[in-house]
Amino acid sequence: NLFQFARMINKKLGAFXFXNYI
């Protein structure tokens, strides 16, 4: 469960960084 939460956070962070890059 914790691993899934970490994956969700990582995905959100990745999307945030991607949006910042664009």
From Swiss-Prot:
The entry's note on the tissues where this protein occurs is:
Expressed by the venom gland.
Could you cite one Gene Ontology molecular function of this protein?
phospholipase A2 activity
Any one cellular-component term (Gene Ontology) = extracellular region
> Which BP terms in the Gene Ontology apply to this protein?
lipid catabolic process
The record's cofactor note says:
Binds 1 Ca(2+) ion.
Q: EC number(s) on record?
A: 3.1.1.4
Superkingdom field = Eukaryota
Query: Keywords for this entry?
Result: Calcium, Disulfide bond, Hydrolase, Lipid degradation, Lipid metabolism, Neurotoxin, Presynaptic neurotoxin, Secreted, Toxin
Cofactors needed by this protein, per the record, are: Ca(2+)
Catalysis: reaction(s): a 1,2-diacyl-sn-glycero-3-phosphocholine + H2O = a 1-acyl-sn-glycero-3-phosphocholine + a fatty acid + H(+)
PTM note says: Seven disulfide bonds are present.
* Top-level EC class: hydrolase
Compartments where found: Secreted
In UniProt terms, what function does this protein have? Answer: Snake venom phospholipase A2 (PLA2) that inhibits neuromuscular transmission by blocking acetylcholine release from the nerve termini. PLA2 catalyzes the calcium-dependent hydrolysis of the 2-acyl groups in 3-sn-phosphoglycerides.
* Entry's family note: Belongs to the phospholipase A2 family. Group II subfamily.
Q: What is this protein called?
A: Phospholipase A2
Which lineage do the record's taxonomy fields give for this organism?
A: Eukaryota, Metazoa, Chordata, Craniata, Vertebrata
